[in-house]
Amino acid sequence: MSFEQPDFLKSQLTQTRDDDKESDHKKWRRYEAHDGIVFCIQLTPTMYLSNPDLGGKIQLLEILDSLNDLMSQLVVVMPSTAVGCYIYNCSHPNAEDNVYELIPLRDVNYKNMKRVSDLLEDIEQDRILLKDEIPIADPNNPIELSPVLIKVRETFLQPIEGQKQLTNKKIFFFTDDDKPAEFLNVDSRSRLRKVVDDLYDYYINFVTFFIGSEDKPFDDSMYADILKWGSKINEAQSWLSSHGPSTNPINASYIKSKVKRTKEIKRIKFRCPLMLDERADLVVSVNGYTIVSHEIPGSKYKLVYANGSVRREAYSHREYLDAETGEAVDNSQLSKVYTFGDEIIELTEDENLKIQSGYSEHESFLKLIGFRSTEQCLHYYDNIDVPAFVVPNEEDYAGSIKTLASLYRTMLFKKKSAMVWGKLRPNSPPSMFVLTPSSKKDYNQGFYLYKVPFMEEVRKLPDFLNHSALIESDDYKVMSKVTETLINFFNLKNGYRPSDFHNPALQKHFKILREYLLQIEVDKSKPEDEGDETLQKVKQIYARIASSAKSDDVKQQRLVKYLKLWNSFYNRLSNLEVDTKPTKNKKAKLNL
């Protein structure tokens, strides 16, 4: 469903008050990411064969399943992402030059999702055959890769009405043919290198899915030469050995997991200079990336109204009213003031800008104050905002990567964190931050930036009851030991990993919407899948306790015995009445 923007809204979106706001808009416009992902699948005879690594499932079906799952996930977390699928070496009647457009490159929508979902359902129910619906072209005369990539490039660059321009573009390239015929021809290889080079010029990147197996390993040497040789190396980054994508082959069983890992594109939260020593003019440039975002079910909706047989989107419009008369006040008559009691202070825009620029000549900046032991300055209860992942940016200050790499190694070795002061956006107030290096166990190498509170932002916690006598008792020590043993039984020391748990509220919300839109029939006689991994974990714990109670093995029986012991201690301690409040002296009643 598409909606037209009314004229008054278009004028409001394009209108700016002054040149400063216009330049500021241009400056931050590059952070408005619009991602595009194209599945580019090469048909080969082996794509239609059952793969033992997939439990006998056909490889091509696994790829289409991954496409279907990807769109279902993007609707939840990244609904503005555009997804398309192009299959080449295909003799479908609608194919152009053996390139079949299964779904066009559009923002995730109901029509494309239903197209893929219905196709998979028809194949699963044996209504159609995969070979008939997506037939392979003559294997003896396969199409070259160059025309396919040119078509994908044109698709990425083509403006689409109602959609923003794509800023992050990826090609998910699937093949199990490691020696295409065109690679043996010098002219074809040269032509393909130029096409790949052209794609990199337009910032279109590859994510390779080179499918191999033990019986037929995939030799990636030819593709590595094409994809990495054709890519360019920036002169300022000449120390990099390669600027191309990874061409490591994967097993077919890893297709879905790799699609899920690489679907999300890095979100730049801020970009600013980091002043290590302002007097010595030692400044580097950094990028901060968003680590997590909060998704709320039912929050992504639009207000529409019926205009005849067409639904149009309704937009909100703000008006300021006179407090006494209720008449609308023109925006040109409004001004910002600060009040202190009965006093009113009015500042002009220039005076406000002067106050904001008093901290630094940079609109956003980070300034190093000093270093401190990580154990002393990094506490979980001091983190008052979502942290950012910080890496060097070589564009503004040359040598930023080498400088921060050296700083990273030193801080990691000495177990230090940096205290920094600054602001991440032009209009935000300055704050205090802790910049700490990622641990050796962390897959990502870089820094985490945590915002910490000032004295005025700290609130008093409630007083705790005094249980010193209880804590020092022998019963409490035994209970602590029993609790520690129980935790070891259930392997809870690994802690909470978000990648193991979906949000059940989100999954339920979008599951209902998906079934409604795709007209999926639900068998109400079957028990509904809860879709909540936390409840599944609880059920596993219950099952383990039950098996321990029924087991004849002495070691297995220890679990239920520890639980009984823990419950007896807990019941005994909870029944103890700790009188912490002094009793009030009641007035004596007179019996008159």
From Swiss-Prot:
SMART domains reported in the protein's UniProt record: Ku78
Complex and partners: Heterodimer of Ku70 and Ku80.
First-listed, main subcellular location of the protein, grouped into a coarse class: nucleus
Annotated family: Belongs to the ku70 family.
Residue ranges, annotated region (Disordered): 1-25
Any GO CC annotation of this UniProt entry: Ku70:Ku80 complex
Pfam family, one: Ku_C
Gene assigned in the entry: KU70
GO molecular function, one term: ATP binding
Compositional bias of kind Basic and acidic residues: 16-25
EC class (word): hydrolase
Places the protein is found: Nucleus; Chromosome, Telomere
Bilayer-spanning residue ranges: none
InterPro entries the record matches: Ku70, Ku70/Ku80_beta-barrel_dom, Ku70_bridge/pillars_dom_sf, KU70_core_dom, Ku_C, Ku_N, SPOC-like_C_dom_sf, vWFA_dom_sf
Cited Gene3D superfamilies: 1.10.1600.10, 2.40.290.10, Ku70, bridge and pillars, von Willebrand factor, type A domain
Catalytic activity: ATP + H2O = ADP + phosphate + H(+)
Domain Ku: start-end pairs: 280-485
Keywords noted in UniProt: ATP-binding, Chromosome, DNA damage, DNA recombination, DNA repair, DNA-binding, Helicase, Hydrolase, Nucleotide-binding, Nucleus, Telomere
Enzyme Commission numbers on file: 3.6.4.12
Any one GO biological process: DNA recombination
Annotated protein name in UniProt: ATP-dependent DNA helicase II subunit 1
Protein purpose: Single-stranded DNA-dependent ATP-dependent helicase. Involved in non-homologous end joining (NHEJ) DNA double strand break repair. DNA-binding is sequence-independent but has a high affinity to nicks in double-stranded DNA and to the ends of duplex DNA. Binds to naturally occurring chromosomal ends, and therefore provides chromosomal end protection. Required also for telomere recombination to repair telomeric ends in the absence of telomerase. KU70, of the KU70/KU80 heterodimer, binds to the stem loop of TLC1, the RNA component of telomerase. Involved in telomere maintenance.
